Amino acid sequence: MVGRATRVAGLALLLLATSCTSGSVSPSPSASGRPTGATHLQLIEAEDAQTLDPALIDDPTSLAIGNEIFAGLTRLDANQRPVPGLAERWEIGDAGRTYTFHLRNAHYQSGATVQAQDALSAWTRALAPQMNSPLTIFFSPLGARYPGDSITGVQAVDSTTLRVQLPQANSELLTLLALPPYWLIDPKQPTAGAGPYHLDKWERGRALQLSAYTGYWGSSPSVRKVDIEIEPDNTKRLDRFTSGGADIAHGFGGSQLLAFARDPQRAAELHRVPNTRATWLGFNTVAGSGYGPTDRMALAQAIDRARVTDLALFGSMLAVPATDLLPPGVPGHLARQLPGYDPAAAKTALDAASFPSRLDLYFSTNATVGRVATDLQDQISTATGRTVVLHPTGDFFNQAALDKLPFFIDTWSADIPYPSDILENVIRANSQFNNLRLFDPAIESALDQGRAATTWDDALKAYQQAEMVALSQNRLIPLYSGVEPYLVRSGLRVPFVGGAIAFHWEDVR
């Protein structure tokens, strides 16, 4: 998997945080003299939104802004659990294959009333070939995957009732409905959403201005105005924040953040928010069949996760040691008891098993994972007395294509804050991205149960069981979970959620 090996290309690399794009700055007033609470929020971003069309959004800045302008049938609460959005309630029937949504009385920013038919119109629009949407795969629960595919199981029963019939049960649907391309739009004015804020002005590459929508169906936001400045230069962006010109800033490199955190007067302004990125060591069941259970446990004991994130990830500024394959930014994460660091036990076990004197380690993606690979090469070599040969990124993909990838570092960044996004891709048999070539009937059964579950709790329990089976075999060894650092001015309370969307403007106090 290359960086963003999931269904929306490029997002993981953007989340890793350093932008090199050029652009100009829109001046914004100094923050001095502003009250400690927030009625006017000033944000500074490294990159502009690429689009604010719900059918096309596939970058983090567009997602964060679009989430404030538009709304779906559901929304995600502080635990990323789907709760009522434009649908005030719903029923699930036919063993999870039929959903009936009852819409609340809500209006778009154009003044038009939200109607059930609008959902079908918005989703059909996103699937239209001329839209060239990169998000059509998200409609797979509805039986559509590609541009031009039709949706046959969605029916507007009346103006406030929408019935969705799925080809097969899929518990991911309620989470998907809170994200693009499922957001509803006014069919006559596609730029008008039903979210808490509307766009007042957009100077491309410079700034955006938004204000609270007075007709919003939810609680009235205390933040009434939001200004977003675009500053690609990391140093200038940090200067804007430290001089009081911005309330919230992010998108910085690890070295900058490390220096910032070492300033005792500034450290409290740094917040590391869990995202959806997971990184692990894996053993291919075919090419890596020579690694037995004892060998895999020994290699797990040869790794100090805290050292990995400290040395390779700038003092854990960009990640934290993993306690699970599912990162904290994805529902279902558990603080599991993973094999602990014990280099002496690792060497003893490998020596007793007459383990070979050489290991070949492959890694995917980018420079960050490359630093991790270099540190793991040193750790494993020092702990076990073996020579660890580190192969370049190109070898990873060549060997993966030939199914000859024995021992490797892999990573996944989920588009959807739901366990299936990671587990269905990483440990489901025959998945394109299952570089483990793992097949276990117990895993398959648990994944099937998670997909077919009709309640949130039952789904998470099943997915956690599937993961437990994979981890108990040490076929994969979780290394670290990603975090997205944010700088927040003192006195401002930001209830960070994490996952795909770090926080909501309307929750800032």
Residue ranges: model-predicted function:
Residues 486-509:
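Long beta-strand-rich cores associated with HINT superfamily self-processing modules
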Residues 44-94, 124, 192-193:
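N-terminal lobe/hinge region of extracytoplasmic solute-binding protein
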Residues 154-155, 386-398, 422-490:
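Extracytoplasmic/peripheral linker and loop segments enriched in polar/acidic and small residues
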Residues 214-259:
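Ligand-site clamp/hinge motif
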Residues 100, 118, 134-186:
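Surface-exposed binding/hinge segments that line
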